[in-house]
């Protein structure tokens, strides 16, 4: 993973296809993509999010994005995570490796204990990714994404404390 950079707008543009956004309400306008890119950069500067471009040895350009951001959920301060791996690079374990690395980053540098993911209940690939990456299914929830578009999601939770305890040396 590499920190989101000013030159990463094409990563979002390549993710903005009908196939890639079927569970996200469909493609965004060009202006919405530019706004999202600016938001990724701004949120990194403010410390409210950490967005990354995903690199793969099999491609010269980034193959997607992953990140986490601060969220208030069920009266707790948590992180939410999201990801996107370009169609040609799906099915090769890239998303699982990127999400695991993203979670480790949150554990190493973040100040919250839980990360949540909210894939639509019918998004079998993203739900399988959550399961495979070690998230626990907490239930279902009603969401709006994009705003004004109600969806039903699975509520997956990952406890960062497990990563923190395994990545720190044992005390004598």
Segments (PLM) and residue ranges:
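Short loop/turn motifs at secondary-structure junctions and domain boundaries
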Residues: 42-48
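Short, P/G- and charge-enriched loop/turn segments at secondary-structure junctions
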Residues: 39-42, 144
